[in-house]
Amino acid sequence: MANPGWGLCTYRGADGADALGALRHADGVVVAVPGPRYGGLIAAVAEWDALEQRLAGWEPADLPAVPDAVLLAPLRYPRKLICAGVNYGSHMAEMGAGAPDPDWAAWFFLKPPTTTVIGPDAAIEIDPDPDEQVDWEGELGIVIGRGGRGITAEDAAGHVAGFTVVNDISARGPHRREGAPHDAFRYDWLASKAQDTFCPMGPAVTPRWLLPDPDDQRLRLWVNDELKQDERAGDMLVGWRELVAAASARVTLEPGDVIAAGTPAGVGMPRAQFLRHGDVVRVAIEGIGTLRNPVVTRTRAATGARLAAPRGG
């Protein structure tokens, strides 16, 4: 199918308020969407049925740009940010984990949405200690539009609003801790996955009516224009429908929740390559968009400036 030409986004207007818009991929222009003004996509997705009815068939190609629009993370903020771990066979192989079992099942961890999620061009802040070994993980993000518990894989598509791009930034150094009081505490998921700015997301959400199935879309990631990851999004061990079902078997999914679907081969750890101050990371998924973020060393001044600014990025 032809790649969709736009996605739903959140922008900050000249009045300083968040608003729902549409991002045209061809020229990067933000345009207004018809209907009531929402305070961003997170507010609109709570009324997904009405939004879908209003925008299905709508085309923003010839609309004027919103003046002085600043693009933010599309969802500010998901109630839950659920991340699938080890969901590509190629990534398992490069990490020395062997081949997946035939009955491989999904497993998940969580990131705190309000402090990890940043938007396009916002800075990924990393600790200056090189032993942190901060890595990249380009991923497909599944955005929930209709909530539920115990959703079947067959019904999952009807609960999905659309798809976005996620970068699951990961600190490899502190992930495994020595001297843990029990095997259950050997891995420090807070230090590894949940640090501030460790979940760039965006630039927009492609509605599912424009991209019914992302499986054939190409997922790529570059660091400083060097291609690191390149794989078909649908090469997941557990498909996106099954991920929705597996997550909803444990928790109630709510509109605006995001499930990050795991990363393919090409991360830095097996090659001893990690992010450094001044790097620029780009993640692109065909039909969804390109997410770009610079990398900066975390300093007290930089963190203070980010926290003092209007929330999000």
Which ranges hold each PLM region?
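Short clusters of small/polar residues that mark proteolytic maturation junctions
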Residues: P34-G35, V165, R232, R292
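Gly/serine-rich nucleotide phosphate-binding loop at the start of the catalytic core
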Residues: A2-E47
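Catalytic-pocket segment enriched in acidic/His residues
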Residues: A2-P4, D15, H91, E125, ...
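Surface-exposed beta-strand edges and flanking loops
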Residues: A32-G35, I126-P128, T297
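Active-site microenvironments in enzyme catalytic cores
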Residues: A2-Y11, A43-L227
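Well-ordered beta-strand positions
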Residues: R12, A22-R24, D135, V143, ...
